[in-house]
Amino acid sequence: MDVQDHTLDQGPQDKDKDLEEEVTVHLTADGDQVVQDPSGEGPFAENIQYQFRTDSNGQSQVTYRVVQVGDNETNPQAVVTTFPQGHQALTQVIQGSFNGESPTSESQGGETRFTYFPASAAIPGDGAGPASGGEQQPGITQPSGAAGGQFYVMMSPQDVLQGASQRTIAPRTHQFNTKIDNSRTVRDERRRATHNEVERRRRDKINNWIVKLSKIIPDCNIDHSKQGQSKGGILTKTCDYIHDLRNSNTRMAKASRIRKGSPST
C-alpha cells in the first residue's frame, strides 16, 4: 500500500504553538514499520506514534498499534489490537474534560484522550488493550488479555455504542384460529329460532285477548288519553269494570230481597 501523510491543523495561526499538532499515519501491507511524528511539537511531543497495517498472512486482519517512545528508552512500548476478518470493532476517542462539556476537536492543555475498546474485539494473548494518548497518566490502563474486560468511558451510551444494532421483535409465526365450529353454530341458530317462534306466538295470543277485552269494555272505545289503546290501559279499565259489575250485582240482590219482604241475612 502507498504511504499517506495526513496533517491536522487544530486551530488558527494566532494560537499558541503548543496547541498545534501533526499526526502522520502510515498504512503498510507488510512489515512492522513505525513512523514518528516529524514535528515534535504540541501534544505529540512525547513521541507517541500511530501505525495502521494489514496482516501479511492474507487473512485481511487489521492491526491497530500504538507505540510510545520515551526520552531515555531504546525499545518502544507498543499496544496492539487485532481485529479478525468480518469483525467490526467499536472504537471511540474521547477528548475533553468529564465535566458535562461536549467533546471538542482541539487539544487543550491538561486533558487526556481515551479510547474505548470492547472486550470482544481483543484476542487473548496478543497484548490487546485500550490506549490513552495526549498526556499519559499512570493508572489509566487496562490489563491485556481476556481477563481485562471492557474499558468504559464517561459519556452517554448513544455516543459509545453507535454501531450497536437495535433489537428487533420476532414476527408472529402462529396465527390464532378464530373459526367457530359449524355444527355448534347451526345448533345455536336453530335453538334461537325456536325460542323466538314460541315467544312470538305467546305475544300474539296475549294481544288477541287484549283486543277482545277492549271491544267488551265500553270505556275503551271513547278513551282519548295519552295511553290510548295501550295494553296497560285496557287491562286497568277491565279490572275497574269487573269491580263495578260485582258491586251492581250485590246491590241488585239486596233490592230483590227487600221487594220480596224477606229480611236480609
Curated annotation (Swiss-Prot):
Tissue localization of expression is:
Enriched in ectodermal tissue.
Which stretches of sequence are listed as region Disordered? 1-21, 119-149
Q: Cross-referenced InterPro entries, in alphabetical order? A: bHLH_dom (IPR011598), HLH_DNA-bd_sf (IPR036638), USF (IPR051732)
Superkingdom of source:
Eukaryota
**Any one Gene Ontology BP term:** regulation of transcription by RNA polymerase II
Q: Where is the composition biased (Polar residues)?
A: 134-144
Name where it mostly resides: nucleus
Its protein name is: Upstream stimulatory factor
